[in-house]
Amino acid sequence: MGKYIRPLSDAVFTIASDDLWIESLAIQQLHTTANLPNMQRVVGMPDLHPGRGYPIGAAFFSVGRFYPALVGNDIGCGMALWQTDILARKYNADKFEKRLSDLDDVAEESWLEENLPSAFAQHPWRNSLGSIGGGNHFVELQQIDQIIDAELFALAGLDAQHLQLLVHSGSRGLGQSILQRHIASFSHHGLPEGSDDALRYIAEHDDALAFARINRQLIALRIMQQVKATGSPVLDVAHNFVSACQIGDQQGWLHRKGATPDDNGLVIIPGSRGDYSWLVKPVANEKTLHSLAHGAGRKWGRTECKGRLAAKYTATQLSRTELGSRVICRDKQLIFEEAPQAYKSAESVVQCLVLAGLIIPVARLRPVLTLKNSGGKKG
């Protein structure tokens, strides 16, 4: 365990192995974050990669002050896994691809009126509910490929004969608006705990957390209705948020930016759209700020993807993967940005967490059909 949880300084740690590549800029950003006032410890996950000033795939613990900029603009972003009643042996790729290709990015008003929970019926951002969003957000039908721990798998309520549905999305424009207002007033200086401004941000942050969770539920509902299926939730875990937390004998604030909690039951670590995802049981560890990787982690920046890939692949070719799955994405730029080649191997990230003693693998899931934003509402 010790050789995989690596101290880079008194306050900076990474979960890493010799076989796992981590970009030097991401390490620099870890050190930069550790130098923020009141910051006590920062931990980079195996999927660590550079962000806009602060790293993604990391957890940060501060005392007396917290930093909304570390959470970023997609407050509440996370993963939700559903068990569907779609029989794997009866899955028809052509039929499902057509049905999901016909689904608009944004839910119709009539659908929202019928399906929105009453608590969100008048929410200012209600029209974004049920929509995936851009970037690395997606919905994916998956099939259990390998059961690694049969007992834990059975306890999870999963069924290997039927397909699973994985939803990765967040608070959409709501989180962005909260961060923009905060940065305009306070820049990157953070907020002293207990202040009126801190309490106001936490209230807005918690609203965005709830909004993101409901959004994932509504996305799953829209998808299942579109393919005439039903399902039940297995897990829903956010990886972008800040919360009050005690680490050792210190009471403070734990920020997670692309970091999955290890104290919230089973979690899923997704791969790229052409890679396996892994259902795992966390092993709680205070040294790593009770956090795990949230995915495979990028190895290429978005702006370089098309230049690296366009000479080898067309957008149509990228809509099929080496694992035999299909990808629906009418945004021709995004399909290059989110190509499997732009990401690390999910297995390398999972293996690093296993060697560090931080997870117990439960099952491996293979992508079947991935849906991403089309780049605008289909009309």
From Swiss-Prot:
Binding site for Mn(2+) 2: 77, 168, 239
Impact reported for residue 294 to N: Very weakly aids PrhF in reversing growth inhibition due to ColE3 expression in vivo
Annotated coiled-coil segments of the chain: none
Keyword Ribonucleoprotein applies: no
Catalytic activity: a 3'-end 3'-phospho-ribonucleotide-RNA + a 5'-end dephospho-ribonucleoside-RNA + GTP = a ribonucleotidyl-ribonucleotide-RNA + GMP + diphosphate
Domain of life: Bacteria
Cofactors demanded by this protein: Mn(2+)
Free-text cofactor note: Binds 2 manganese ions per subunit.
EC number(s) recorded for this UniProt protein: 6.5.1.8
Residues the record lists as binding GMP: 136-140, 239-240, 277, 294-297, 372
One GO MF term attached to the UniProt entry: metal ion binding
Record-listed Mn(2+) 1 binding positions: 74, 77, 137
SUPFAM superfamilies in UniProt: Hypothetical protein PH1602 (SSF103365)
Residue numbers annotated as active site: 294
UniProt keyword terms in alphabetical order: GTP-binding, Ligase, Manganese, Metal-binding, Nucleotide-binding, RNA repair
A biological process from GO: RNA repair
NCBIfam families for the chain: PRK09588.1, release_rtcB
Family: Belongs to the RtcB family. RtcB2 subfamily.
Job of this protein: GTP-dependent RNA ligase involved in rRNA repair. Repairs damaged 16S rRNA in 30S subunits that has been cleaved between adenine-1493 and guanosine-1494 (E.coli nubering). This specific cleavage is inflicted by CdiA (ECL_04451) or by colicin E3-type (ColE3) proteins. Poorly repairs damaged rRNA in the 70S ribosome; addition of release factor PrfH improves repair about 3-fold in vitro, probably because PrfH hydrolyzes the nascent chain allowing ribosomal subunit dissociation. In vivo the PrfH-RtcB2 pair restores growth in the presence of ribotoxins that specifically create this damage.
Name of this chain's protein: RNA-splicing ligase RtcB2
